[in-house]
Amino acid sequence: MKFTHLFFIGLLTKVYTETVTVLSTRSYRLATTESTPTDGTVYLTLTRQQSSSTSLNASTITTPPSNSSASVQTTAVTDCHFHNSVQYCVDGYGNEGSILPVPTNTNNLPTSYDGCHSHDGDTFCMDGDKEVQFVKLEDEDDEESSSSSGKKCHFHAGVEHCVDDNNHDAVTCERVKRDYDIPLRIGLLFVILVTSGIGSFGPIVLKQFVNLSQENYIIVIIKQFGTGIIISTAFVHLMTHAQLMWSNSCLKIKYEGTGASITMAGIFIAFIIEYIALRIVNARDTGKVDKKEIEETSSNEQSLHGISVNDKISVMILEAGIIFHSILIGITLVVTDDVYFITLFIVIVFHQFFEGLALSSRIISITNASLSTKLVMALMFALITPIGMAIGIGVLNKFNGNDPSTLIALGTLDSFSAGVLLWTGLIEMWSHDWLHGHLRNSSFVKTTVALVSLILGMLLMSLLGNWA
């Protein structure tokens, strides 16, 4: 019996002291040992080695003690390199992962990050005074996640909106530090300027040189397409963005009708300005012409709701609503994360061109304004979005889209602009042309062309709402 015990003791001793060979096709790190002075536990640290087999002595392999307060056992990630513009690094356990946010300028980037620590199960490291996130490859749930693993993020009006895997809001109200490609933004500012100018000046120049009548098919197509653009902008872009602002979890407003109330105020203010202008015009005309002449002129030139759509005041109200939200477009485009910037920029280019076309289609209809006045109105639209972009570049390193004051400012302007555009789009443009204008008794062909143009404007602008 004693001999048997000695035999098993010897066998166990032999097994525990033998060298164990691990075969793998992956790159492992050379095993080194480090002992702690407190409990004598031996830890295994790996260093990279290109080899198909690595020998590890079983006596040096022990499992480190679990620590519920931290999931990161090292304080640095090293061997950082690039694959397809994404920076990958390796942590102390040989796990490869990517660095978020994705850097836009790949020059002079560090090959390692230190000061690594854990927040809610996620690993963060320091790049100077900036914090970056290290996400292990097996933990990445979505390639489009810009904030952290398990989050799906996108930008609406410059504000990042994130949801987790259960479609619950995953919003941080603190400012997120990002690297912005400022030279790119400055260069594309001029592209927006040119595109907006083409849209706003194009119809004016066309009518000036070709001298088309208001009932010409080209003018009808431009005007009805523009009407569809304005209607879609109000409903799909402004009201949707405003609702996202007012429903943001960082904004503690209990009244759910805030955005709709401000939109209603925008409609009322647009109406009251136009009504007062009408009363002033009527009072001025009463002293000059017979009341009968006023009524005859009104039946031919004015719509039943009180003021001619061709009047300068009406178009100025329309332009005011467009300008309010165009300056926001410039600001929010610039502060968008680089991952989404180019996509949003392309959408905004089309957005500004279509909206400039819509505004200009009404500017050319003004009968009581000179050419210079029309050109100034077109120039104001062309400049306003680049001005917004310049403001955005100036506040780039301070902007926090989830700050309550920012949300209130953006939400108020979006809601108010929606109200103004709803009044001008529905009353001054759509209703006037179709119920009280020349399209009321137009031919079947012209009616069909106008209707298709109207629907096309709505569809295209609504489609852009998927990205902007």
Swiss-Prot record:
Following inactivation of the gene, the phenotype reported is: Leads to poor growth in the absence of exogenous zinc and impairs assimilation of zinc from host cells.
> MF terms per GO, please?
zinc ion binding; zinc ion transmembrane transporter activity
Does Acetylation show up as a keyword for this record? no
Gene Ontology biological-process annotations: zinc ion transmembrane transport; zinc ion transport
Q: What switches on its expression? A: Expression is RIM101-dependent and up-regulated in alkaline conditions. The promoter contains 2 RIM101 binding sites 5'-GCCAAG-3'. Expression is induced by macrophages during oralpharyngeal candidasis infection. Expression is also increased during hyphal transition, biofilm formation and surface adherence.
Q: Which residues are glycosylated?
A: N57, N67
| Keyword Transport found | yes
Q: Name one GO cellular component term.
A: plasma membrane
The residues that cross the membrane are 186-206, 218-238, 258-278, 315-335, 339-359, 375-395, 407-427, 448-468
| UniProt-listed InterPro entries | ZIP
Q: Which reaction does it catalyse?
A: Zn(2+)(in) = Zn(2+)(out)
Which keywords are on file for this protein?
Cell membrane, Glycoprotein, Ion transport, Membrane, Signal, Transmembrane, Transmembrane helix, Transport, Zinc, Zinc transport
Q: Give the way it sits in the membrane.
A: Multi-pass membrane protein
Extracellular side stretches: 18-185, 239-257, 336-338, 396-406
Q: Where does this one sit in the cell?
A: Cell membrane
Role summary: Zinc transporter that acts with PRA1 in sequestration of zinc from host tissues during infection. The pH-regulated antigen 1 (PRA1) binds zinc from its environment and then reassociates with ZRT1 to acquire this essential metal.
Family listed: Belongs to the ZIP transporter (TC 2.A.5) family.
Protein name, entry field: Zinc-regulated transporter 1
In its UniProt entry, the species of origin is given as Candida albicans (strain SC5314 / ATCC MYA-2876)
Gene designation per UniProt = ZRT101
